[in-house]
């Protein structure tokens, strides 16, 4: 499983077993909005405020979750899955030279680990996805990857701007 960057503004393709599952697209160059289609439903991630500290997750015009960034860069992803159950995940950024982005659930169990695939010779924004089988088989897993990919690209953009 991996996330392949298609542009520098944050667009990416999510592949699972060498098959394209979905593509996340930013409609305008400096737009903080992101749009994708998953399970024949339109999913939009859009900023709630000017500062970019809260993003809304909107499915088919109905608010279904949020991505919250506090002043210490603690990031929480909250969304309602297909079974109408609230899912909450927290980001932990590990490493300095070799970064890893770990997303854990409320119980503290690591669900997804995203690792950048770049080296000092070749700079890319692609990410490898690692997860245990009991989580990768969950119905909400692919949807969670959308939000995790968006968050990691957001962090990389903050770091590039010197905000972090």
Task: Describe each PLM feature range.
Residues 24, 32-67:
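Acidic (E/D-rich), amphipathic helical modules within compact regulatory domains
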Residues 1-33, 38-40, 71-74, 79-164:
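Low-complexity or membrane-interfacial segments used for flexible interactions
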């Amino acid at each position: 499983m991996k996330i392949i960057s298609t542009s520098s503004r944050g667009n990416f393709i999510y592949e699972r077993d060498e098959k394209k599952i979905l593509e996340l697209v930013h409609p305008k160059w400096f737009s903080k909005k992101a749009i994708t289609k998953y399970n024949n439903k339109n999913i939009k991630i859009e900023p709630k405020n000017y500062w970019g500290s809260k993003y809304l997750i909107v499915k088919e015009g109905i608010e279904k979750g949020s991505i919250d960034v506090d002043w210490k860069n603690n990031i929480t992803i909250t969304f309602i899955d297909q079974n109408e159950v609230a899912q909450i995940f927290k980001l932990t950024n590990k490493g300095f030279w070799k970064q890893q982005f770990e997303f854990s659930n409320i119980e503290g169990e690591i669900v997804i680990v995203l690792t950048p695939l770049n080296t000092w010779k070749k700079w890319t924004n692609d990410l490898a996805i690692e997860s245990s089988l009991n989580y990768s088989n969950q119905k909400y897993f692919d949807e969670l990857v959308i939000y995790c990919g968006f968050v990691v690209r957001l962090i990389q953009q903050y770091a590039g701007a010197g905000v972090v």
